[in-house]
Amino acid sequence: MKRICSLFFSSIFFVSLVTFTSSVTAQELERDLIFTPNALPSESHTTSLNLQIRGGSPPMVLPFLDDFAWPSFFEESGVDRPELVRWDSSPVRRTSTFALNPPTIGVVTLDGLDADGYPYVFNSIDAHGWADTLTSREIYLGGLTTNDEVTLSFWYEGGGIGNAPDLGEDSLIVEFKSIGSEGDLWTRVWEDSLDVMSTDAFTQVVIPISDGIYLHNNFQFRFRNYGTLMGNADLWHIDYVFVAENGITGNPIEELAFQYPPFTLLRSFSAMPWTHYSDNPEFYINDTLVVGHTNFGMGPNNQENTGISIQLQDLDPIAFENEFIQNVSVSEGPFSTEYMADLLDAQGVPASILFNPASSDTTAVFEVSLWENEVGYYTNQSAVYDNDSIGFSQVFTDYYAYDDGTAEKAYALEATGGQLAVRYPLAIPDTLDGLLIHFTPFYDNAELETFVIKVWADDAGVPGEQVDTMYQFHSPQYFTEGYDLFAYYAYDNPVPVSGIIHVGFIQ
């Protein structure tokens, strides 16, 4: 019997990008993402450079704090900003879109991928074991006693948007390091094997560091996960790791923080061609941007003042200052704010034409920055790595995109001849040159399998007749240079298109 090989992918570009959430039939497969290429700086997958930290830096002093909003791995900051580094190198990555309801923007995610972004055990259907390890830098605890009430606290969640750990099979543990006569000794001090784990909310854990064997000058702690070794599944997310004296309650320092990174100010798309946007800018701009925050504590900083700025790349800023929430009290815990309502720039231009069509004739990229100034000042930087200021690029070039470009799961058609399409309403007539698709390896290497890319006209909301005939066979291309990279697949010939179209492939 002929074996049918499924092509697992997670996103497609029409010269565009979309993550599929279609319903699954008997001839379709949906799988948690088993492979993710190597990390980009924003979602860093650390590699083994490490001893430059353990061998070249003195132990850290308390308090130890990391909410994973800044680049705290050596591979991100070790050379230029060693004071930001909190961790020894490990096969762990910072993510900002995998978790649900995180305390602050950015978490660290433990999974079944190694330091190169490949499964620890590839081409296997059932491989479990110890996977990722995240180890702190050495911390100076010498001279402290039980009376100092040193504690480790953190927040954690299983699964989130990705695949959750399996009941009775997977676990997350914490270990402390003591010094024995024969070297370092690691002792398990906490474990969650799904007895109390939540897949859509974070739980706080507080662990006393009270035993005298841990109160030494080279103390370290580490997180380890036991689960699948086959890729990006059985996910554990950790946030707001805090070690301090007098910290028995585990309360962090008082502050306001963002929860998620926004990725678009457009109504439906995350990116679109500049000439298409310019045809009707007020239609495509969103009328609001709701952003989630967390308020830790109810002290003097529970007055929130927010701002937003837009800057055309390589040009002077276009000043937008959103202060309509100025001096408003916010409740403790999660809350949200709207950044677009009643927003005007210095010349009174409304937010409905936030990205001025006069900025360019062909393409434009805008840097969008949002901030909270509960600390008493604004920042004009773009994409600041901090939990009270965030940024993203709003891209207008030559493609349409729907989502944020992060692939949490893989999707496939199981049957030969299976067809898949994504719907795009075009602003103006244009010519379609090709698709960008992110494929992910799943069990079998599908590089020798083939598919044909297609484009269909719309028929009452579903694909209708093929717009053009395509014959060119393509094969999946995989990358190891970074996360969520896309391969370009050109149509046999440029295709004139207008109105609503559907793009995809037949395998």
Model-derived regions: residue spans:
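Surface-exposed, low-complexity/disordered Ser/Thr/Gly/Pro/Asn-rich loops and linkers
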Residues: 86-149, 160-162, 237, 406-411
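Extracellular carbohydrate recognition and processing domains
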Residues: 182-214, 467-490
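Beta-sheet-rich sandwich/jelly-roll-like modules and their strand-loop junctions
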Residues: 373-461, 500, 507
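Short, well-structured beta-strand segments enriched in hydrophobic/aromatic residues
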Residues: 217-224, 356-371, 435, 487-507
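Aromatic- and Gly/Pro-enriched, solvent-exposed loop/edge beta-strand patches characteristic
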Residues: 449-507
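Extracellular carbohydrate recognition
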Residues: 127-133, 166-167, 216, 227-245
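Short beta-strands within extracellular/lumenal beta-sheet-rich domains
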Residues: 126-147, 151, 203-206, 413-426, ...
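Extracellular glycan-recognition surfaces and repeat-rich motifs
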Residues: 28-33, 37-123, 167-169
